[in-house]
UniProtKB/Swiss-Prot annotation:
Organism for this UniProt entry: Escherichia coli O139:H28 (strain E24377A / ETEC)
Known catalytic reactions: FMNH2 + NAD(+) = FMN + NADH + 2 H(+)
HAMAP family from the UniProt entry: RutF
The protein's name: FMN reductase (NADH) RutF
Family from the record: Belongs to the non-flavoprotein flavin reductase family. RutF subfamily.
One GO biological process term: nitrogen utilization
Top-level EC class as recorded in UniProt: oxidoreductase
A molecular-function term among this protein's GO annotations: FMN binding
Species lineage: Bacteria, Pseudomonadati, Pseudomonadota, Gammaproteobacteria, Enterobacterales
């Protein structure tokens, strides 16, 4: 059996561009958020996406208890916010750095996000160090900004919507 080592896997994954997202929650366990690129569509019937979350992350217990989350997809220019939510900054400072609305699930929804998916966690599957959170989408909010933000080759890149 050929086992791929961790560094080879990580180097190869850096070749896969992905949207940059801030995942937020609020509920009985408190308010929390983190930056994630491990987010993708599962199905449109019913509308479902998935988010991967390391069980060793400081935010894991909060998301695990609240069972709701909002995927806030960032637009170009929001790199500092991504870095803030991706570090060890206290939660109150993370949330103070942007404007938020409360979504239908009670989760913080970033006002200037490219798109926000307000969700309830419907299923959790554990694989290795991570939980895969399957999220039933209850509401979607889109912003008119024409620029997206992706993480590719270990750095941020802006994308522009084509003119119609």
């Amino acid at each position: 059996m050929n086992i791929v080592d961790q560094q080879t896997f990580r180097d190869a994954m850096s070749c896969m561009g992905a949207a940059v997202n801030i995942i937020t929650t609020d509920g009985p366990a408190g308010r929390a958020g983190f930056t994630a690129s491990a987010v993708c569509s599962v199905t449109d019937t019913p509308p479902t996406l998935l988010v991967c979350l390391n069980r060793g992350a400081s935010v894991w217990p909060v998301f695990n208890e609240n069972r709701t989350l909002c995927v806030n997809t960032l637009s170009a220019g929001q790199e500092p916010l991504s870095n803030l939510f991706g570090g060890k900054t206290p939660m109150e400072h993370r949330f103070a750095a942007a404007r938020w609305q409360t979504g239908v699930t009670g989760c913080p929804q970033l006002e200037e996000a490219l798109v926000s998916f307000d969700c309830r966690i419907s299923q959790v599957v554990s694989v290795g160090t991570h939980d895969i959170l399957f999220c039933a989408i209850e509401a979607i909010h889109r912003h008119a900004t024409p620029y997206g933000l992706v993480w590719f080759d270990r750095s941020y890149h802006a994308l522009m919507r084509p003119a119609c």
